[in-house]
């Protein structure tokens, strides 16, 4: 990894997320060690079971850590999960703090557990993935966020972990509409590198979808490792940057006070 060419990591979790035990200070220390100038703390706010205390603490810690150092900008982020499943709670979460960056995600579809807990066969997987993209399209049309996280999230578990192949062809019209809606609304698409921590893992989404986003008018790409521990911070970033470059992007984007700021590639 050529550490000097990693501009940012805008998908990080701390012990303010239910699935991480890493203090925010350790994530910042690791980013500084790697020479990364921008990071965003994006702790989980899965809207059906979020903690306002954790989100407020994450936000405050980002501000405190940002004030400590001149060599890194620590952004106040949030990973807003399943926002359409309780709109009142979503409004409350978005109004709780001032954020630099709202990263939107969908870990579970209505009436189902997180894909992490599901082990569908091929027929069940086809139905679940269809419902996932239907709800994701609704979410993208809602539009109250900055970047869309891990577009192909179900494949992290259905295909990568459980080895169930999924024919994506039937979903391509919905995926095209999702990406064109992001592009038309000036939203970013995340290249999530977490899959590359696994043997034979892949980017979420893969490079062909990044290229499709660009062809449909997409302007902004964010990069995120989805690291829950310091050793995973920035893993796979070179591959993510390569995918963005190959698609025709000239830089990646960070959001400061909810406004896009492009960082040109080195």
Across the structure, where does each feature detected by a protein language model lie?
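Short, basic/aromatic-enriched C-terminal tail that caps enzymatic domains
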Residues: 244, 249-266
